[in-house]
Amino acid sequence: MKFTLLVVGRTVEKHYITAINDYVERTKHFISFDMEVIPELKNTKNLSMEQQKEKEGELILKALLPGDVVVLLDEHGKEFRSVEFANWIERKMHTVNKRLVFIIGGPYGFAPKIYDAAQEKISLSKMTFSHQMIRLIFVEQLYRAMTILNNGPYHHE
């Protein structure tokens, strides 16, 4: 099984890039994990928010493979405590055969067709974060989940 984080647009803040890369590398000690970047849309001045979401949605769908289990990181998704998230991940590790794909959308969220393609939605907080920052929060939580499952010293209850 492989874990993939699919994001729209590259991370631009240098301090986020450094921290994200650190957690991605740490996480790879436990699982097969990668981050795929869908290029940001160009020339969006004349596009409505809905049009941008639709165009991003087309690119997201092209990046998905048959058999992928798709989980959206969405403000309306299910919330977990860190230990609950670790247990959820463990269940997925026993039931998903191919890729477990977590998707972070662009600044306006997801097109309806992406919601239709998803099997689940999870939320990392009731608060709103930039789509750049949530990448760091997610990879940290995935790493934390791996240390919980492997009895590592990182997480404290």
UniProtKB/Swiss-Prot annotation:
The keyword Nucleotide-binding does not apply. It is an enzyme of class 2 (transferase). It is found in: Cytoplasm. HAMAP family: 23SrRNA_methyltr_H. CDD domains: RlmH-like. InterPro entries: Alpha/beta_knot_MTases (IPR029028), RlmH-like (IPR003742), tRNA_m1G_MTases_N (IPR029026). The lineage of its organism: Bacteria, Pseudomonadati, Bacteroidota, Bacteroidia, Bacteroidales. Specifically methylates the pseudouridine at position 1915 (m3Psi1915) in 23S rRNA. This is Ribosomal RNA large subunit methyltransferase H. It comes from Phocaeicola vulgatus (strain ATCC 8482 / DSM 1447 / JCM 5826 / CCUG 4940 / NBRC 14291 / NCTC 11154) (Bacteroides vulgatus).
